[in-house]
Amino acid sequence: MKNPQKLAITFLPLYVIPTYTLCIKALYKNTHAGLLFSFLGFVLNTPAMSISGPPTTFILYRLHGVRRVLHWTLPDHEQTLYAFTGGSRSMAVKTDARCDTMSGGMIVLQHTHTVTLLTIDCSTDFSSYAFTHRDFHLQDKPHATFAMPFMSWVGSDPTSQLYSNVGGVLSVITEDDLSMCISIVIYGLRVNRPDDQTTPTPTPHQYTSQRRQPETNCPSSPQPAFFTSDDDVLSLILRDAANA
C-alpha cells in the first residue's frame, strides 16, 4: 500500500486550489461591504497575518457599468481607457477597514515591460499608482483576469504622495456583467514622516499629506472610529503603518 502521507500531499492541491478559486470569485462578485470586511477580518486575524511587523494593506476597487473606450498597443507599451458609472473603494489595514462610494469616472491602465500605471479619476476620488515589476506581459482582453507581483510602487491622491519599495500584488478582473475589480495587496509599510526632528534610519518611503473633506461612506458599511472623517486613503495607510 502506498504511503498515505505522500498521497495526501499529492492530492492536496486538487482540494485547495478549487476552494481558493471559489472564495476569490465569491468575494469579487459580492457587493456587500459586510461580507468583504468579514473576509478581510478573517484573513487579517489568522496566525500568518498576526506576526509582528508592518501590516498588510488591502485596497479594493469594485466598479460597475464598465466599458472599454480605447485600447492601443505598441511593441513595448499597452494602454487601455475605461469608463464606469459608479462603484466603491474598500481598504483594510491590519484589522481596520473602510468603504467609500465612488461616482462615475474613467480608468487608465498603462503597461510596459517594467512599469504598470493605474489612474482612477472620478468626482469623488482621484488615485494614481505606478507599480514596478519584472518583465510581465499583460493580456488585456474582455473578461480577462491577471495578477501581477510588483517590487515597488508609487501612489498619489489629491492630498498625499507615497513611495515604497515594499512589494505586493496587483490584480484586475473584468466580468460578464460589465463590472471590474481592481485589488492591490501591499505586504507591509515603513514610513518616514517629513516633520520628524530626529534623523531617522534611512528607509525607502517618503510622503507628504494634508487633509480634505471625506467621500460618502458606503451605506452598508459601519462607521468605524479608527478612521477620522477627514483622512484620505493614503493618509490612512501611512498613519496605520506608522503606528504598527
UniProtKB/Swiss-Prot annotation:
Residues 193-227 are annotated as: Disordered. The keyword Membrane does not apply. Its main location: host cell. Keywords: Host nucleus. Signal peptide: none annotated. GO terms for cellular component: host cell nucleus. It is found in: Host nucleus. InterPro entries: Herpes_UL4. Residues 205-220 have a biased composition (Polar residues). The keyword Ribonucleoprotein does not apply. Belongs to the alphaherpesvirinae HHV-1 UL4 family. This is Nuclear protein UL4 homolog.
